[in-house]
């Protein structure tokens, strides 16, 4: 086995290893109550990360093999060496024009569809009639994707496989005949009633319409409604172009995205359809930042600033910030966001989240609870100073509650006795002379600024209510 084949075999095992990791993750989720509140990693994020790595490794392997072949073109071995094929069965089905077998095989391996998708376009090119092959695959497996099928998860997997097949057909730009369009029209009419508000159904339907050029059979309003439904998918803009929506219709769609708060989706449509002149993407991005900041504050307020709610709000705000940063870097408009200091905002939010995590560990039940008398002497943990940036979650600082005075007012404490001396109504409290005239004069001593020792601690001692129990009182 050559090095390239060994690497290809290892890449092919990634999906199997991901399934084992998924099982371990599910076991961990069963004990979620024992985890830190800040642990909010989802399996979709993990799966997306490893799928991205798998795709990147596969592309780099293909590039390395291709460059090796071009560099050694004179050697016989280099001429015969081909890019390693991870799914040779795909080509076998395509060479035999076995569409039904191809569809069933892809559905059985639907969990590995990302790896399959890398080879599918080249495999379909091996077929003499790619368009009938794809239609046969869809017709042969369409019953598995109906809403009445036994497993809804399987139905979703089948629709995803249909999307992969139709995307590959769009990529190779296969020849279409009227008979093929008629077959595709029949499938489309059967598919349409099942769409409802399900984006996965709308995505497959629109790919069928785009691949077999059926846009004229449906109203533009219907097509726009379905595109609005699938706007979260990256293929939405490609489908718009393939179906042939005019610029005015796309502009109406963008305005609808803006009116419904899907600002980042609107940004994607604006740039990919070159509509920067009609809209102001920089202003839209800044509005998105403002909305995410206000939403985070609102979530915190509604959740009474609990630790869990604060972490959730921070995660959502971080996600929005990173999405904006990605667009800003891709479109080279960093100069428009110098004042916002987006990277610093991300770091500050991450620091706030880490600080809350440390505070949670410090106050966790694992720490022995301190006596109540000693708690009052502890200082509150220092809170990071808020900066001038507006992206921090505005959590009001803890204000000490106003305690009632521990002693009565001076006028209630002090009384003037018949001899003109100040006396205290508190038992055991001796009061010194309030005024030199009190001893010899006939005028009662003024009590405007009395001196009473109960309010003095002397020699830097803390007030009585703050003294730990080992100080004599």
UniProtKB/Swiss-Prot annotation:
Claim: Iron is one of the keywords in the record: no
Polar residues compositional bias, start-end: 361-373
Region annotated Disordered, chain positions: 356-384
Coiled-coil residue windows: 3-35, 306-361
Effect of gene knockout: No effect on flowering time, due to a partial redundancy with FRL1. Frl1 and frl2 double mutants flower earlier than frl1 single mutant.
Tissue distribution: Expressed at low levels throughout the plant, with slightly higher expression in developing seeds and the highest expression in pollen.
Transmembrane intervals: none
Pfam entry (one): Frigida
Covalent S-S links between cysteines: none
InterPro entries documented for this protein: Frigida
Keywords in alphabetical order: Coiled coil, Developmental protein, Differentiation, Flowering
GO biological process, one term: flower development
Function: Inactive FRIGIDA-like 2 protein.
Miscellaneous comment in the UniProt entry for this protein: In cv. Columbia and cv. Landsberg erecta, either FRL1 or FRL2, but not both, is functional and required for FRI-mediated up-regulation of FLC.
Family named by the database record: Belongs to the Frigida family.
Protein name: Inactive FRIGIDA-like protein 2
Annotated organism of origin: Arabidopsis thaliana
């Amino acid at each position: 086995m050559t090095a390239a084949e060994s690497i290809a075999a290892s890449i092919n095992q990634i999906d199997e290893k991901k399934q084992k990791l998924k099982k371990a993750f599910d076991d961990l989720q069963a004990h979620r109550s024992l985890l830190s509140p800040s642990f909010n990693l989802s399996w979709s994020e993990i799966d997306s990360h490893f799928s991205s790595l798998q795709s990147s490794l596969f592309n780099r392997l293909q590039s390395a093999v291709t460059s090796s072949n071009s560099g050694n073109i004179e050697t016989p071995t280099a001429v015969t060496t081909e890019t390693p094929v991870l799914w040779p069965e795909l080509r076998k089905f395509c060479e035999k024009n076995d569409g039904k077998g191809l569809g069933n095989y892809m559905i059985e391996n639907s969990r590995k569809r990302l790896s399959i998708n890398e080879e599918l376009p080249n495999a379909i090119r091996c077929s003499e009639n790619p368009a009938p092959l794809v239609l046969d695959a869809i017709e042969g497996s369409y019953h598995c994707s109906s809403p009445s099928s036994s497993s809804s998860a399987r139905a979703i997997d089948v629709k995803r496989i249909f999307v992969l097949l139709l995307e590959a057909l769009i990529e190779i730009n296969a020849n279409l005949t009227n008979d093929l369009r008629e077959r595709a029209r029949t499938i489309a009419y059967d598919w349409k009633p099942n769409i409802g508000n399900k984006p996965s159904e709308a995505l497959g339907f629109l790919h069928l319409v785009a691949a077999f050029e059926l846009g004229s059979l449906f109203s533009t309003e219907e097509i726009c409604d379905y595109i609005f439904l699938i706007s979260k998918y990256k293929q939405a803009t490609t489908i718009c172009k393939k179906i042939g929506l005019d610029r005015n219709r796309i502009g109406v769609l963008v305005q609808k995205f803006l009116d419904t708060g899907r600002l980042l989706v609107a940004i994607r449509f604006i740039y990919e359809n070159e509509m920067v002149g009609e809209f102001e993407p920089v202003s839209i991005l800044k509005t998105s930042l403002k909305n995410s900041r206000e939403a985070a504050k609102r979530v915190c307020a509604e959740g009474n600033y609990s630790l869990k709610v604060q972490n959730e709000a921070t995660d959502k705000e971080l996600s929005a910030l990173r999405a904006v940063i990605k667009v800003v870097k891709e479109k080279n408009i960093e100069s428009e966001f110098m004042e916002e200091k987006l990277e610093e905002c991300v770091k500050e939010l991450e620091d706030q989240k880490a600080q809350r995590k440390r505070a949670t560990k410090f106050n966790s039940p694992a720490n022995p609870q301190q006596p109540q008398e000693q708690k009052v002497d502890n200082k509150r943990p220092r809170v990071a100073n808020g900066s001038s940036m507006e992206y921090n979650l505005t959590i009001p600082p803890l204000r000490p509650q106003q305690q009632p005075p521990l002693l009565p007012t001076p006028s209630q404490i002090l009384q003037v006795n018949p001899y003109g001396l100040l006396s205290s109504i508190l038992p055991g409290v001796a009061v010194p002379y309030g005024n030199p005239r009190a001893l010899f004069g006939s005028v009662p001593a003024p009590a405007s600024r009395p001196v009473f020792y109960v309010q003095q601690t002397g020699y830097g001692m803390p007030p009585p209510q703050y003294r730990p129990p080992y100080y004599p009182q």
